[in-house]
């Protein structure tokens, strides 16, 4: 293998959006001499990373999964959110064979239909409209015992915003005359993705045993009590909802459980705890023999459970195209974004392509990343620099999670520190790429840290934004072609590498080498 390759390096600064106003802008107010200089001196532009430009509904903020799928595919990929909205609107959702079979089986056996998911209008991991449609589907097909286990958001939505959703669903159940909200828990516990199994166990025990820190008879009241304890939506402790004289709504053998999240990365752990016979993340006090356990979308190829909406396969993504041309590639990130530069960037393909190496750096084990805004950036940079210098790779894809993960905490000073950490890392990466006569693209998958307070509510802004993101090129003399979006990045890299662009990629190169 050649040992003097000049790599095409893509650095994705997660959650690093562009916003002109300084107020509450951790990116603009941070000391970033390196990025400032690159923006002034190198070919650059702003590119779209949200809404219709990435296959989401118009105006919908971008997110990491969607961003990386578009980055790697080189075409606009219509997302699960858009697809499900369309299915519900046109009525096809209510005839989905996997969903209807699970409900019918439970109804015929006199069993309950349990629905779990992130109860949120955020549209990143789920949408509450889909959960409502599922409740309606179950009711239409004769289910009497319909139980909603609500995971609360406060991360892709304002930190204390769940009341409207809980009231909406309390009213919906009352109107249907069947079913109820059975439990509440913050997504911090139910949707962990970093192998913190003690968190997931709390959600598992809540659903399987109706075991919670609190028991009350009213969802909105339970939320208010959580706020009084100092818990925002994301961190609401396990709460059982049970009125006087009502039976507990825990899972029983033969029940159906339908998981209404459509995004995979934060769904996998809790699903494995329910369905994997050899699960060993924590001791399960009670193992459920489900009538059916249904995933809304495919969370991982190795999870053996029915899937209502299997993925549409993407051919000739950036990674696959490199493999077909005998090129070598590296994917590298921390735990928090490792799935994004591998599984999502490869269009939902779990296994590495031939010639694709992967490096995983452990994210620090802290409760929230404002406590360590540097995260593992120093170690990640060291490994990246070594890979660039090695001469082994034609292309390197790297994600720095700091802007997004610290942005999600809503802690402004920590976000500033995260951005300043990134600037120092970028300085080293630029020098390393220049030293081997390589090429470098710096961009982001969506915004976050540029808006740390919500001007409308005055609360911390913990969600993503729908703002554009920067794109900077360092390498050969070149000029920018404006009007770009994330799906233009893969064709841009291929063009800069002197490679043909596959016909499946409808994106356009954004830099013309002079």
UniProtKB/Swiss-Prot annotation:
GO terms for cellular component: cytosol. Its EC number is 5.4.2.12. GO terms for biological process: glucose catabolic process; glycolytic process. Coiled coil: none annotated. It is an enzyme of class 5 (isomerase). Substrate binds at residues 125, 155-156, 187, 193, 263-266, 337. Pathway: Carbohydrate degradation; glycolysis; pyruvate from D-glyceraldehyde 3-phosphate: step 3/5. Binds 2 manganese ions per subunit. InterPro entries: Alkaline_phosphatase_core_sf, BPG-indep_PGM_N, Metalloenzyme, PGAM_B_sf, Pgm_bpd_ind. Mn(2+) 2 binds at residues 14, 64, 445-446. Its cofactor is Mn(2+). Gene3D superfamilies: Alkaline Phosphatase, subunit A (3.40.720.10), BPG-independent phosphoglycerate mutase, domain B (3.40.1450.10). The keyword Manganese applies. The active site is at 64 (phosphoserine intermediate). Keywords: Glycolysis, Isomerase, Manganese, Metal-binding. Belongs to the BPG-independent phosphoglycerate mutase family. Catalyzes the interconversion of 2-phosphoglycerate and 3-phosphoglycerate. HAMAP family: GpmI. Monomer. This is 2,3-bisphosphoglycerate-independent phosphoglycerate mutase. The gene is gpmI.
